[in-house]
Amino acid sequence: MRSKFKDEHPFEKRKAEAERIRQKYTDRIPVICEKVEKSDIATIDKKKYLVPADLTVGQFVYVIRKRIKLSPEKAIFIFVQDTLPPTAALMSSIYELHKDEDGFLYITYSGENTFGDLFEEVE
């Protein structure tokens, strides 16, 4: 999925910003969180987050749910490079595995599992 944030900000500017953030806040991870384009779920009010390194994916999902005021009975899925990350994984480990070359971790969210059942292991 194409990132609007990437489209709106040149690579060098994004990279410099991510480096500045990582130097100033060594225990935080710069995250860009955007809605999957065709999803009918609410659009988030801000895209850029400074996430504590020890936060789990599940805790981050909780933050997103609150920001978009999603009712408890509604589903939300988050994706990192079109894959569902494990809920118990630390954001720091997801960052190390999937950070973009500009230094940000890009996460998308949707009200439906738009990429299918990607958490199965492929043999």
Curated annotation (Swiss-Prot):
Task: Note the lipidated residues of kind Phosphatidylethanolamine amidated glycine.
Answer: G116
Please give one Pfam family short name. Answer: ATG8
Biological process per Gene Ontology, one example term: protein transport
Main location, first listed in the record: membrane
Q: How is it modified after translation?
A: The C-terminal 7 residues are removed by ATG4 to expose Gly-116 at the C-terminus. The C-terminal Gly is then amidated with phosphatidylethanolamine by an activating system similar to that for ubiquitin.
Keyword vocabulary terms for this entry: Autophagy, Cytoplasmic vesicle, Lipoprotein, Membrane, Protein transport, Transport, Ubl conjugation pathway, Vacuole
Q: Describe its membrane topology.
A: Lipid-anchor
Q: Does the keyword Transport apply?
A: yes
The record's PANTHER family line, in alphabetical order, gives: MICROTUBULE-ASSOCIATED PROTEINS 1A/1B LIGHT CHAIN 3-RELATED
As for what it does, the entry says: Ubiquitin-like modifier involved in autophagosome formation. With ATG4, mediates the delivery of the autophagosomes to the vacuole via the microtubule cytoskeleton. Required for selective autophagic degradation of the nucleus (nucleophagy) as well as for mitophagy which contributes to regulate mitochondrial quantity and quality by eliminating the mitochondria to a basal level to fulfill cellular energy requirements and preventing excess ROS production. Participates also in membrane fusion events that take place in the early secretory pathway.
Q: What is this protein called?
A: Autophagy-related protein 8
Species whose genome carries this gene: Pyricularia oryzae (strain 70-15 / ATCC MYA-4617 / FGSC 8958)
Q: Which gene encodes it?
A: ATG8
